Amino acid sequence: MSAFRDQRGFTVAEVLIAAAIVAVAFVALGRIVPIAGYAVQEGYQGSTATFLADQKLELIKDLPWVSTPANDCLGISASATAAPNVPAGATCTLGATTVNGGNALPWEANENTTAITNFNGYSRQVRVTDCGSGAGCMGIVDAGMRLVTVTVSYTPLTGVGVATAPKSYFVSMLISQQ
C-alpha cells in the first residue's frame, strides 16, 4: 500500500492554473486570426490592383503615336479628371478603328467597378499628360514625351469590415513618340 502513497499527480489548483493559461492563449489567438485574415486580403487586393494597372500600361505602350504619317492613338487628357482624347487636328487609326481629333479613345476610357471582366469591385482610370507643355513631366519638358498614369481603385476590407473610403494604386510610365 505504501507504493500508492508515494505517487503524486496534479493537484486541482495546478490543473486550474494550467487551464487558465491555456484559455488566455486561446483568447489571444482568437484576436489575432481576424487581423491575419485582413492582412492576407489586403495583400491580395493590393497585388490585384497593381496587376490591373500594369495590364493596362502594357496595352497602352503598344499604341501607335507617330508623327509621319500622323497617327496619335495615345491621346492627351484635357485635365486630371478627364480620360484621354485624340488631340485636335490629329486622328487615330488602330486596326479597323478610326477616331477623329477631340474624340475619346475607347481603350483608355474610365472603367467602373463592374467594367473589368473577372475583377468586379475594381475601377481603372488612364490619364495622359503632355510633357511638352507647362512644367513638363517629372522635370522633362519635351513635346515627344507623354506621362501615362493608370490608377486602380477598390474598397478594401479592414480588421472590422469594409472601409469607408476607396484605396488607390497607381503606376506611371513615360512614353516617347515613335
Task: Label the predicted regions.
Residues 10-54:
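Aliphatic-rich helix starts adjacent to a transmembrane/signal segment
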Residues 47-178:
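Low-complexity, Gly/Pro-rich coil/beta segments used as flexible assembly/activation regions
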Residues 1-10:
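N-terminal leader/signal peptides at the extreme start of proteins
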